[in-house]
Amino acid sequence: MNLIFAKVLCLLAILVLMMLGSLIPVKISEADFDKSSRSRKILSLSNSFAGGVFLATCFNALLPAVREKFFDLLKIGNISTDYPLAETIMMVGFFLTVFVEQTVMTFRKEKPSFIDMETFNAGSDIGSDSEFESPFISANHGHNLYEGGHSHHSHSLNIKELSSSSPIRLFSLVFALSAHSVFEGLALGLQEDGNKLLSLFIGVVIHETLVAMALGVSMAKVNTHLKDAIKMAVLVSTMIPIGIVVGMAIQSAQNMASSIASALLQGIAGGTFIFVTFFEILVKELEEKNDRLLKVLFLVLGYTVLAVLVLFKW
């Protein structure tokens, strides 16, 4: 299959699945999401699987590709060094992602009643050891958090506040929340072989669809109007496609500057995958009391599936 065509298919699939994930809960808001323990268990295990996929994507696909790119670039420049450039760039990407998220939270002037940042993670909170509560279930065990009260979390955003914001403010807030998604898209758009593209796509589409579903549930909880829900869903869902398009444009240039940009951006994207895996998925899923070993099994399974897929050419 033509690689450009495959990337376009990835773009469309991610866009459609994230839009559906965001909007379906709004259309069926009468469903009792909080009591659906089976659904939450499935989401939680899927998220753990996605964590394993991201680990394999980062360390079995992206890291070797970035090493190879830097090796070729240094060879062209007749430069010899044993310094771990690929690993360093990945850590730059990791710290950059942490910095962007924490900067947004630091400069927020208020703590409006929920939406919690954890809403952008798709995990469950049943039996959590954490002092923080679920974005879906309040400390009073079942009262709607969106009816009032304040978050134990310092980073919280209000769905109604977001949906009624000016377009520029809405885009800036959602972009800040989804900044790492752009780098995930860049990683997809910059890929040069099919097997790595497939492994990246599987990890991204699983995790980001779950993220979109979590957002959709939160919008349903506060009875967000469909028009406002569509506005939110479109903004969140287009972050990865934007990254894919930019990555494809850079990769198609086929010159020295594009090669350097590709190596740097793929390394930064690798750091983003590390952030998503450890800060958004594992820290959330493995803190819970229920199904811990099962989640570890799905984590290992996700890693194994992608580690095997990387062996094959597609």
From Swiss-Prot:
Bilayer topology: Multi-pass membrane protein
Protein keywords: Cell membrane, Ion transport, Membrane, Transmembrane, Transmembrane helix, Transport, Zinc, Zinc transport
GO biological process, one term: zinc ion transmembrane transport
Reaction catalysed by this enzyme: Zn(2+)(in) = Zn(2+)(out)
Annotated TM spans: 4-24, 42-62, 85-105, 170-190, 197-217, 230-250, 263-283, 293-313
Side of membrane Extracellular, spans: 1-3, 63-84, 191-196, 251-262, 314
Superkingdom assignment: Eukaryota
Entry's Gene Ontology molecular function annotations: zinc ion transmembrane transporter activity
Cytoplasmic side: 25-41, 106-169, 218-229, 284-292
Function: Transporter for the divalent cation Zn(2+). Mediates the influx of Zn(2+) into cells from extracellular space.
Protein family: Belongs to the ZIP transporter (TC 2.A.5) family.
Full protein name: Zinc transporter ZIP3
Phylogenetic lineage: Eukaryota, Metazoa, Chordata, Craniata, Vertebrata
